[in-house]
């Protein structure tokens, strides 16, 4: 069965509400999209998704660049900075259901006319990493005596994915960690109880634009715990990259891989592949990015941390 990617892009107005309605940091949007772009009707769309640091430079999140080709010249009159954009995809022509990729806030649209007569609109969509959410006042401000998992869940309710070994998740916080905001909480536990925190795609079934993935360097697990990248259309044998990190010059092994685009592979997942010598390499996904087009290739690009490190 041949892959035939199509995309649906929805544009929403952000709902005007009282400050108390958004004190949790969630954005409220109108129920019905004001514009829907569906590539099944002949529209050419190119999308790239990359990693960037948010206004809080300790949190890395996603940014999408969408290029729409040959739309009506007045298209930009119907969208505005701050609109909420949702992006969906499907892999096969016979499929009816579109799966969610990401949502975010629209930046300033850029239009370009080409000598060939083509016309493009370039849209910058940034994963919503809300200042309201990071600076909201916490009810529980002291975390000493709690497990790392319970502390994270109390600060990031319904927004957390904890990709850590059980030992690390259940570790008791024995330091005097006091934080009045989520921003302060991350400042104090990162590098002590967690290795990294990354904002990633949220769940389309709610108003939450992003979730926060908490990771530690995890140990190697049994083979059955790993997803084989070959099952997801591995495009080439991953390339090895060796870096020296930290003040103790720790040697780290990473791999760069590329598979057919899917929403079923996420940061923190355990994945494996067979190298050129026939050996199974076990890794953890460190970063993801994507190149998508309904007229070209659709790839998910992975940075993998070797679990043998």
Language model features by range: what are they?
Residues 76-88, 134-143, 266-274:
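Extended Gly/Ser/Thr-rich low-complexity repeat segments
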Residues 1-124, 254:
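Assembly/oligomerization scaffold segments
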Residues 47-78, 215-309:
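An acidic/polar, Gly/Ser/Thr-rich interaction patch typically located in mid-to-C-terminal regions
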Residues 73-75, 112, 192-197, 291-293:
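Short beta-strands and strand-coil junctions in structured, solvent-facing domains, enriched
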Residues 116-137, 297-309:
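Short solvent-exposed strand/turn elements
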Residues 101, 113-132, 158-245:
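Short beta-strand-centered interaction patches in the first periplasmic/extracellular domains
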Residues 145-162:
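Glycine-rich, acidic and aromatic/proline-enriched surface loops and short helix-turn segments
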Residues 149-153, 183-186, 252, 265:
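Extracytoplasmic/secreted envelope proteins and their assembly/folding machinery
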């Amino acid at each position: 069965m041949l892959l035939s990617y199509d995309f649906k892009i929805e544009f929403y107005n952000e709902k005007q509400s009282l400050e108390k309605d958004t004190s949790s940091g969630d954005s409220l949007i109108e129920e019905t999209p004001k514009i829907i772009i569906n590539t099944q009707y002949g529209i050419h769309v190119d999308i790239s998704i990359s990693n960037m640091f948010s206004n809080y430079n300790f949190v890395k999140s996603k940014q999408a660049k969408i290029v729409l080709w040959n739309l009506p010249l007045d298209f930009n009159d119907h969208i505005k900075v701050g609109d909420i954009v949702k992006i969906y995809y499907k892999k096969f022509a016979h499929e009816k259901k579109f799966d969610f990729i990401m949502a975010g806030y629209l930046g300033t649209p850029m239009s370009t006319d080409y000598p060939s007569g083509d016309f493009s609109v370039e849209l910058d969509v940034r994963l919503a990493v809300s200042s309201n959410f990071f600076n909201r006042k916490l009810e529980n401000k002291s975390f000493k005596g709690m497990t790392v998992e319970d502390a994270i869940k109390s600060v990031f309710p319904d927004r957390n994915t904890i990709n850590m070994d059980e030992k690390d998740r259940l570790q008791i916080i024995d330091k005097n960690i006091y934080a009045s905001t989520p921003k302060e909480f991350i400042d104090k536990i990162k590098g002590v109880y967690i290795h990294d925190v990354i904002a990633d795609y949220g769940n389309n079934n709610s108003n939450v634009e992003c979730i926060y993935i908490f990771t530690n360097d995890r140990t190697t697990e049994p083979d059955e715990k790993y997803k084989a990248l070959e099952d997801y259309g591995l495009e080439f044998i991953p390339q090895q990259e060796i870096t020296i990190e930290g003040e103790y010059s720790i040697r780290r092994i990473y791999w760069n891989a590329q598979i057919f685009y899917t929403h079923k592979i996420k940061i923190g997942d355990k994945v494996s592949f067979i190298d050129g010598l026939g050996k199974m390499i076990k890794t953890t996904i460190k970063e993801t990015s994507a190149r998508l087009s309904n007229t070209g290739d659709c790839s998910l690009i992975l940075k993998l941390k070797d679990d043998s490190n």
